[in-house]
Amino acid sequence: MRILYLLLSVLFVVLQGVAGQPYFSSPIHACRYQRGVCIPGPCRWPYYRVGSCGSGLKSCCVRNRWA
């Protein structure tokens, strides 16, 4: 009977970990969610970098609001 309580507590821990997973399946989707575009290399004006896409060779760039 004790094993059931242990398994139930492990199940709750696993479910809490799954609930904390990000919704986005890839960095490209996360970049699009921020209204950004993936550009190879550094961001150029009027864009600025907010992150990276994939392997880090591409930058997630967002257009500057004041340009």
Curated annotation (Swiss-Prot):
On tissue specificity, the annotation reads: Expressed in bone marrow, testis, ovary, lung and trachea. Expressed in the ovarian stroma, but not in the ovarian follicles.
Work out whether the entry's keyword set contains ATP-binding: no
Q: Where in the cell is it found?
A: Secreted; Cytoplasmic granule
Q: Which GO terms describe its biological process?
A: cell chemotaxis; defense response to bacterium
Return the GO cellular component terms, semicolon-separated: extracellular space
Keyword annotations:
Antibiotic, Antimicrobial, Defensin, Disulfide bond, Secreted, Signal
Cysteine disulfide partners in this protein: C31-C60, C38-C53, C43-C61
| Propeptide position ranges | 20-25
Per the record, the major location class is: secreted
Asked if the keyword Phosphoprotein belongs to this entry, the reply reads no
Pfam families xref list? Defensin_beta
Give GO MF terms, alphabetically.
CCR6 chemokine receptor binding; chemoattractant activity
Signal peptide (residue range): 1-19
Give the protein's function.
Has bactericidal activity. Potent activity against S.typhimurium and S.entiriditis.
Q: Which family does it belong to?
A: Belongs to the beta-defensin family.
| Protein name from the UniProt record | Gallinacin-6
Q: Which gene encodes it?
A: GAL6
